[in-house]
Amino acid sequence: MKLKNILIVVKDIEKSKQFYHDLFGLDTILDNDGNMILTEGLVLQDEKIWKDFLDKDIVHKNNSCELYFEEKNIEAFVEKLEKLYPSVEYVNRLLTHSWGQKIVRFYDPDGNLVEVGTTMS
């Protein structure tokens, strides 16, 4: 068995598709009308459809998980983030951990936590 995809719930699937394409270069593999699979295994799920499946409230900004990406040139990434999405809500602006890794954390347009860090290899 293997983990195939990670699904996040979004209010506006087109806006989220654009966000993940602009910042991470993710492209659409499959669009199933409210369920969109992007490259790298990320799935965007329309909030209304997900709520109907679960019959439970969606809790945005629950800070219980994050999407983690690695980027060699993190300073250039942060510049791109601030240029394309100047109103992004940061959790941590660019910082350097004691072990030398640089990271930045922010919310996507739907409150999903995203971290971008430098490679540690």
List where the protein language model places each region.
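Vicinal oxygen chelate
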Residues: 13, 67-113
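Conserved short beta-strand elements that form part of the metal-binding/catalytic scaffold
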Residues: 27-61, 113-118
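Short glycine-enriched loop/turn motifs at secondary-structure junctions
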Residues: 1-3, 59-64, 97-98
